[in-house]
Amino acid sequence: MVAGSGTFNLESKLDYMNAGDASINGTTIDRPPLTFFNPNDLDSNPAASALAKVAAINAKSKDTGVTAVVNTNVMTGSAMSVSPSPHSGFVVVNGFKIPLSTLSNNAQGSRAAVVAAINAPKAFESTGVVAIDSGNDAAGVILQAKDGRNIQIVFQRDAGSADDAAFAAVTGLKQG
């Protein structure tokens, strides 16, 4: 690790870095590369992710003497409840729509189904997110992005299914 000094302008909202928002050892850090600006993925805001900020900082590492690393992004799950009837719908993870179905009166089985759906090869390739069964109804399904990208979850329920809070409770996922 290299010692240095710098400044960061931080706001309460999650926004991408602009040129001049950060300075390290007297060197202005530019905005993240354009590859992080995806107009089709407004939900997860990849340009504001830790991954994008690290790329911007590391682009100037020869000038600053500093390299940045990103930590795994972890999104905790939600407490689960069981339902006498199965629920179905979709979870949109980082802009990618994944079909989900839960089981009747079986939180453990529902967690396993959610984990399998999110970890399916096509879903993982599209989202970069891994689902982990916490093994605990109180903790639900944990999501991780090892490369530090943002994790954004949105529910789309089938007609007649429960509201978002009830759907979250039977899937073990947290919307946000």
Positions of PLM-derived features:
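Small-polar (Ser/Thr/Gly)-enriched, low-hydrophobicity segments
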Residues: M1-S12
